[in-house]
Curated annotation (Swiss-Prot):
Zn(2+) 1 binds at C47, H70, C157. Its cofactor is Zn(2+). Homotetramer. GO terms for cellular component: cytoplasm. This is Alcohol dehydrogenase 2. The keyword GTP-binding does not apply. It comes from Caenorhabditis elegans. Binds 2 Zn(2+) ions per subunit. Pfam families: ADH_N, ADH_zinc_N.
Length: 351
């Protein structure tokens, strides 16, 4: 079943080789299988992982040529013959991870991103930097009519990644969490989700992002580049160390520092992806202080629903910058320069 006026071709942003030119081209509109939806993409968030993919950091897992993007939101325009629970006109979200098996121990326990059978939009299959995309009905996320669709798009990866990583810290209301890279796209989500969850936030980033972080709700701000002995400073600021740390910064030093200023029995969660992520570990300190170290990547269907609900209810308000599909290369450069302080979203109605 299809709505009217679906074109044969569409605009898509493609690269032929890692680090190569990013070009908007005309490609065929995909046809959905019997258990798939065809979604007209209205918005697609631009994630730091898209930059990593284009640069070849995920070459071991990605395909090339590739249409990137994995934070899509739009409207269902075609449904396959065996699709259940969806109608034409429904609003749908497309998240990074799809095609998980639903039968392994990870899928059955709510840890779908760890399934060995997953595929990733914008990495090993064409993603959301195109006007139309197919997705299995069970992988699509329902987005209510009460939700701002442009705001929902970046939640499908960036927002849920920040939200789930904060849950992983086990920081309780009233306790302190430190967020490194707090002024970037993930950190901007992180500050607001942390506040909504009752945490007290120490934001760590370049001094130019202090006002931005404080406006989002950070109680304290620490200059990541010019603070003498940042470890001692944060330990003093937090009266003995943070209860939890989420390292959004895509650099090794913040990860190393986090292990030093987290308090005894605290939890450090690594999210940011530095190019060379190998760091030294003081195992004696980890053992004697009972420090927990975790990695965290995106979230389950339930995590996504919960993260979007904060947006729908107006509790989380992360600034969004709307751009054209042709602007993605310049956004990547700004990401590399550390000059992104909001979630940047492609608006497909902009030409």
């Amino acid at each position: 079943m299809s709505s009217a006026n679906i074109p044969a071709t569409q605009s898509a942003l493609i690269f032929e080789k890692y680090g190569g030119p990013l070009e908007v081209r005309q490609v065929s509109v995909p046809q959905p299988q019997e258990n798939e939806l065809l979604v007209k993409i209205e918005y697609s968030g631009i994630c730091h992982s898209d930059l990593h993919t284009w640069e070849g950091d995920f070459e071991y897992a990605s395909i090339c040529p590739l249409i990137g993007g994995h934070e899509g939101a739009g409207t269902v325009v075609t449904i396959g013959s065996k699709v259940k629970g969806w109608n034409i006109g429904d609003r749908a979200g497309i998240k990074l991870i799809n095609a998980n098996c639903l039968n392994c121990e990870y899928c059955k326990t709510g840890h779908e991103p760890l399934c060995d059978h997953i595929q990733n939009y914008g990495i090993d299959r064409h993603g959301t930097f195109q006007e139309y995309l197919t997705i299995r009905d069970i992988d699509a996320i329902k987005v209510s009519n009460d939700t701002n669709l442009a705001a929902a798009a970046p939640v499908l990866c960036g927002g849920v990644t920040a939200y789930k990583s904060l849950k992983a810290t086990n920081v309780k209301p009233g306790q302190i969490v430190v967020l490194t890279g707090a002024g970037g796209g993930l950190g901007s989500f992180g500050i607001q989700y942390a506040k909504a969850m009752g945490m007290r936030v120490v934001a760590v980033d370049h001094i130019s992002k202090e006002d931005h972080c404080r406006n989002l709700g950070a109680e304290w701000f620490v200059d990541a580049f010019d603070t003498p002995d940042i470890v001692a400073h944060i330990r003093k600021l937090t009266n003995g160390g943070a209860h939890g740390v989420v390292s959004f910064a895509a650099a090794k030093k913040p990860m190393e520092y986090a292990l030093e200023y987290v308090r005894k029995r605290g939890t450090v969660v690594f999210v940011g992806l530095p190019k060379d992520g190998t760091i030294p570990l003081d195992t004696l300190s980890l053992i004697c202080n009972e420090i927990t170290v975790k990695g965290s990547i995106v979230g389950s269907r339930m995590d996504v629903d919960e993260a979007i609900d904060f947006i729908t209810r107006g509790i989380v308000h992360v600034p969004i910058e709307l751009v054209k599909l042709e602007d993605v290369p310049s956004v990547y450069q700004r990401m590399k320069d550390g000059k992104v302080t909001s979630r940047v979203v492609v608006d497909f109605s902009m030409r």
